[in-house]
Regions:
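Flexible, acidic/Gly-rich N-terminal and inter-domain linker regions that tether
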Residues: 1-55
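Short helix-terminating capping/connector loops at secondary-structure junctions
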Residues: 50-53, 103-107, 138-142
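Canonical Radical SAM [4Fe-4S] cluster-binding loop centered on the CxxxCxxC motif
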Residues: 54-88
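Hydrophobic faces of well-ordered beta-strands that scaffold small-molecule active sites
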Residues: 55-59, 109-111, 143-149
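Conserved, mostly hydrophobic/aromatic
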Residues: 64, 91, 113, 147
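Glycine-rich anion/phosphate-binding loops
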Residues: 82-92, 151-154
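A short, N-terminal amphipathic alpha-helix
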Residues: 91-101
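Conserved glycine-rich "GG(E/T)P / GGGxP" loop and the immediately following alpha-helix
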Residues: 99-136, 149-154
Length: 154
């Protein structure tokens, strides 16, 4: 086979530190300065706007059993399994609040579970969360669905 060819100029051009990819959209696209009325207004405009595009959901499960020293994610390191029960109840309340503005049964074409480590949840808790999502949203067949896992726990 032919020897590999590397363009030295191309290597010099891209041999610089770049942004660390962690998620899409990236964290700088999220706003923390929105008030509850502003969020409600945004959701209302989304629900009643001319385009009824499918939704994309991000479900954040912040818990991890141990810290990964390379990780820059928003996380809570704990061995206390009881924290997830209360957190799931809050996720269900948040879904209900969002759907109060959007309406139930909205089509979801993309969903990602991130963390933390979503597989911190026990099997029954994962089932509970999926059931909560399925009763509130309509998951598009053939949609894009993903979950971050700790391979040591699967």
């Amino acid at each position: 086979s032919a020897p590999a060819f590397f363009d030295p100029e191309l290597i010099r051009r891209f041999d610089v530190p770049g942004p660390r990819y962690t998620s899409y959209p990236t964290a700088d696209r999220f706003l923390t300065a929105l008030s509850s009325p502003e969020v409600a207004d945004h959701l209302s405009r989304r629900a009643n706007g001319p385009e009824q595009r499918p939704l994309s959901l991000y479900v954040h499960i912040p818990f991890c059993n141990t810290i990964c020293f390379y990780c820059a994610c928003n996380k809570i390191i704990t061995k206390d399994r009881t924290v997830s029960e209360r957190y799931l109840a809050y996720l269900e309340r948040e879904m209900d609040a969002v759907l109060a503005a959007l309406g139930t049964g909205r089509l979801v074409s993309q969903m990602h579970w991130g963390g933390g480590t979503p597989t911190f949840l026990q099997a029954a808790e994962i089932s509970r969360l999926m059931a909560a999502i399925r009763t509130r949203f309509s998951l598009q067949e053939g949609g894009e669905y993903s979950i971050e896992i700790d391979p040591r726990k699967v």
